[in-house]
Amino acid sequence: NATVIVEASKWISDNEWVLDLVKHDPDRYIGLVGSLEIGTPDFKKHLTDLSKDARFVGVRMRERPGGDSFFENEAVWSDLQFISDRNQTLDILMFQYSLDDVDMISKRLPKLKILINHVAGADIEGKPADPKWIAAVRKAAKNPNVNCKISGLFQQSHRQPSPKNLSFYKPELDVLWEAFGQDRLIYGSNWPVTMRGGTYGEYLRVVNGFFADKSRASREKFFFKNA
């Protein structure tokens, strides 16, 4: 019964506040994937300072300053290398990034552990998964340092209110299971944002339903060991 928190705001004080907020129960709150501005002059200092608390385990890349030219900034690559050298993780929120970006980063930094958020940015419509998305998922998954979170299902649904039946989400979940397998899929609650689309219990029932026919070892890896 432990939790890795994702994420604070990009303010340093908010990252510190979250760590302080949960320090009373270190056995339950075992990690924070924080938010820092990659490619900025103080990134390395802030990451070093925050990581003095061992629960600060990684950074989520959310915004994309400079748009398409973001990865032309060598400071970005220097900071990503710094994360890798520290053996910390990089979460990638797919709203501003593509699976091609994931593939590029993973090839250039093969020792950096990458976690794609929110079912790899799938557009879920309750029908067979988009072939272009399938191809992009398989390409990214060929890199052994790339992992994927099953999170944000209700938010990725084109139909709102979001359906609560497994069959609506299963085409995309099948693709992710085939591509990443039991060792590189990770559960993410996306709480409290999940509550915009339904209750946490409804979300958990969908995910549990998908894993009902998987082995106990697979379920344990997905729900906690892979994290």
Predicted regions and their residues:
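Catalytic pocket-lining loop regions of alpha/beta-barrel enzymes
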Residues: V57, F70-I186
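Mid-to-C-terminal alpha-helical segments outside catalytic/metal-binding sites
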Residues: N1-A2, D174-V175, A179-I186, M195-A227
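Mid-domain alpha/beta scaffold segments of enzyme catalytic cores
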Residues: N1-R86, P131, S167, R205-V207
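Divalent metal-coordination and catalytic microenvironments
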Residues: V18, L32, V59, I83, ...
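Active-site environment of divalent metal-dependent phosphoester hydrolases
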Residues: K10-S13, G39-P41, R64-G66, Y97-D101, ...
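N-terminal cationic-hydrophobic initiation segments that often serve targeting/anchoring roles
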Residues: V22, P26, S51, S106-K107, ...
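Short beta-strand segments
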Residues: V4-E7, K149-G152, I186-G188, F223
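Alpha-helical elements of Rossmann-like donor-binding domains used by nucleotide-donor carbohydrate transfer enzymes
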Residues: W17-D20, K45, D49, D101-M104, ...
